Amino acid sequence: MPEEVHHGEEEVETFAFQAEIAQLMSLIINTFYSNKEIFLRELISNASDALDKIRYESLTDPSKLDSGKELKIDIIPNPQERTLTLVDTGIGMTKADLVNNLGTIAKSGTKAFMEALQAGADISMIGQFGVGFYSAYLVAEKVVVITKHNDDEQYAWESSAGGSFTVRADHGEPIGRGTKVILHLKEDQTEYLEERRVKEVVKKHSQFIGYPITLYLEKEREKEISDDEAEEEKGEKEEEDKDDEEKPKIEDVGSDEEDDSGKDKKKKTKKIKEKYIDQEELNKTKPIWTRNPDDITQEEYGEFYKSLTNDWEDHLAVKHFSVEGQLEFRALLFIPRRAPFDLFENKKKKNNIKLYVRRVFIMDSCDELIPEYLNFIRGVVDSEDLPLNISREMLQQSKILKVIRKNIVKKCLELFSELAEDKENYKKFYEAFSKNLKLGIHEDSTNRRRLSELLRYHTSQSGDEMTSLSEYVSRMKETQKSIYYITGESKEQVANSAFVERVRKRGFEVVYMTEPIDEYCVQQLKEFDGKSLVSVTKEGLELPEDEEEKKKMEESKAKFENLCKLMKEILDKKVEKVTISNRLVSSPCCIVTSTYGWTANMERIMKAQALRDNSTMGYMMAKKHLEINPDHPIVETLRQKAEADKNDKAVKDLVVLLFETALLSSGFSLEDPQTHSNRIYRMIKLGLGIDEDEVTAEEPSAAVPDEIPPLEGDEDASRMEEVD
């Protein structure tokens, strides 16, 4: 039975908190939590729920609003009293509601929340278990709740969390209808009385609540009055505060006089400081995602985007949609104009899509809501079906969320396709986010085809403009069965590469892929529109040939068979095989990689990885093939020399030099560049007619040994033998 205390006519009843609630409050008060600010979110969310209820009731019975038409939430900090007050004009509580809801009947979530807390859950989840009110004790030592329901008198609930609370009829200032929560803040929590802090917390957690949240602040302003009024005001103040030691001072900020001898002299004026109450609405940005897209202007979208992201520029594109049926949610998605500098920083928490459930903010870093490759998309998702008490663990298992995610990805791809029709804007988008699209091709097998339609590349025929793979296919020759591409560091480098010589000469278009991520992209993108993607830097390049060309190729293979064998013997393990090339025109030779090995570009990328796996590098790098150009005079002369004497040291020397030069021109790096340089210098001396013996006689220290170790050795295979 509650204990009754009589104070004159006022009856105060004391109740004990239900055991689980007392335990929860003890946990909240005695444990340190860093994000105490969530108490404000919870109290505002409760106020919003109460306003939702009265609004719903008023739909069937408009007279419910006779006790107050305006639906709003007010926040009133009072530094003198050290109180923070929240007032709403919601449905209010009856005495029975007060006793039951705030203390004697445990909500089903109380125990679950305590178990979650002890298991390491975050305090910010408190509202999701229906016990958000008690988060007030994170910052308050005492809480007073004054409430008025249409069906009952005005009551006051009060507790300092000592295991009990009191309820009494309240004969103070009538509040009409609704609830007033007065927090008597702890000494170390006065930051929540500061204008800046309150605004910051409301903006972070509650800026999209569907009712106006107004902050009431006592401020000072200067007022200009005449001397007579100043004297009167001063007199009044002195009378009011005559018992006070410190009397208010009227600040004289100067007087305006006219030195006119006329009778109409201007009255002397003084400036005094007066106090006034400033009212500022904190959530002017209403949840526009709940409105009809046809009624929203681009300016409104722009303002909303800026308030959501703190970006100073407008968005590039927007997609506003709702899904109805078995599942109901609304979403508003934006593409920014530029990529953030930390777009691919793994450790950084991305707060790009805010998740709301029925207009109440749940979280802003929900990985399950959008795949990583779309992490640049900003926006809001508001679900009608997710429970408010959703936790991160539950989200990971949520089937509803999986459906929402699928829809978001689909709508994002629609948005990209729409944007692609506007060449100018798509160019800006592609410059900023092409890496994301390529990452999507690598990761998202379901949407790979749609993503591949969004890719744009420079090609051997596109000039300064970029072209899509669809446009490439539309320009393909009748005999062409594949899409030819080359990967490299820059457009200039790949355009001048030996690999594209024959392909371009035959009139086939080559796609230039110059971003490191392209290497990963083409590993997954094997074909486009039924046409396979073929690298011109890998073995097995097949160009459409007529009978004459086939015959010529067979003759060349037979003619150069012995040279190929000899070159393979000289280079030994450096190459897997030496063959006749069908891709060279003006270059004597090139290095190609096996179909499944790394390209030169990929090898360069992998070597640059700080945490590379050396075991993988060993077998992926080993597959190099040397292709020689049968029509090149260097190769023809080398064949003749080899036919004459296959043990000629000069032949061996030239083969190694050709191989190393081909490595460089094909985009690979040399393991021992110094030896290669020495070999080149020696060639220069020969060309200039400088006698090697003279140099060695003058500088014995720089003498070259008579016999350089043989080329066949694993370690020293790249060293050059002395030229006779």
Swiss-Prot record:
Chain residues that bind ATP: 46, 88, 107, 133, 392
Cross-referenced Pfam families: HATPase_c_3, HSP90
Compartment list: Cytoplasm; Melanosome; Nucleus; Secreted
Segments for region (Interaction with NR1D1): 620-723
One GO CC annotation: plasma membrane
Chain positions covered by the region annotation Interaction with AHSA1: 215-552
Residues the record marks as site: Cleaved under oxidative stress: 126-127
Residue segments, region Interaction with NR3C1: 9-231, 264-608
Region (Disordered): 222-270, 694-724
Positions of short motif TPR repeat-binding: 720-724
In-chain residues carrying the UniProt-annotated modification N6-succinyllysine: 219, 531, 577
Residues bearing PTM Phosphothreonine: 297, 479
Primary location: cytoplasm
Subunit structure: Monomer. Homodimer. Forms a complex with CDK6 and CDC37. Interacts with UNC45A; binding to UNC45A involves 2 UNC45A monomers per HSP90AB1 dimer. Interacts with CHORDC1. Interacts with DNAJC7. Interacts with FKBP4. May interact with NWD1. Interacts with SGTA. Interacts with HSF1 in an ATP-dependent manner. Interacts with MET; the interaction suppresses MET kinase activity. Interacts with ERBB2 in an ATP-dependent manner; the interaction suppresses ERBB2 kinase activity. Interacts with HIF1A, KEAP1 and RHOBTB2. Interacts with STUB1 and SMAD3. Interacts with XPO1 and AHSA1. Interacts with BIRC2.
Description of its domains: The TPR repeat-binding motif mediates interaction with TPR repeat-containing proteins.
The protein's name: Heat shock protein HSP 90-beta
Gene: HSP90AB1
